[in-house]
Amino acid sequence: MKNLVMQKKRGRKPKVKETVAFDPKSVQIFKGSELSFNESVFRPMSTGTLMDSILSTDKGLMPAVNMIICGGPGSGKSTVVLDMLSKLASKGKKVLFVSGEMDEIGHFKYCKRMPGFKVVPTLFLKNYTETVRETMEYVFDQGYDVIAIDSIAEVIEMFKDTYRTTESAAVLWFLNLQSTVKKGGNKLKKYTSFINIQQVTKAGDFAGSNRLKHMTEAMSHIDRIKGSDSRKVYFSKNRD
């Protein structure tokens, strides 16, 4: 049962915060032997690139994973992710790129430079700033094999601005949405994998809530090698 609590700050309209009444009967504890999922959750999605060798021990992106790819400005995060999505799309996987930073013109120019990216369906989140939550929940519910989000920071800021809430509340919604969808909570019951793009600070530290780092299965880092167009990609955490 949800109760509505009104919060009012000086000079601002009151915010509505939902609180959930605790029901002890809803608590469940499982043994590993009691859990059951479709075997498809163990089938890696191959990109056919070198990325497969580090995405998992099974050589490919595993279903039902939410991972973060982080790096500094210009390190090539979006390029690497879009390349992965385009390769997966060419192999019949249903993919989605959620762009919180580029609009249609920017993406069109990007695809002009990288023609292979034209096959990737893209949601331009700037067109839905007043309905960020509703839009993302509706689209994700359609069912995808892989969804990439560029970037976590932009989605969190949009959510905070639209619903006049805190960063912790926005992060909680973001993580809960991905948790539900990756477990098959969508119309097609797909075990969706999420690739979340995030920047790092000038000092090279992760920019964002530590909760994001701890509540995701994998953390990947991209560094551009000085004096070349090559990039170094490595994982500091990968449960697959």
How should each PLM-predicted stretch be described?
Residues 2-114:
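The Walker A/P-loop phosphate-binding site
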Residues 23-27, 32-34, 141-143, 154, ...:
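Short, flexible loop motifs at catalytic/binding sites
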Residues 178-240:
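Phosphate-binding/switch region of NTP-binding enzymes
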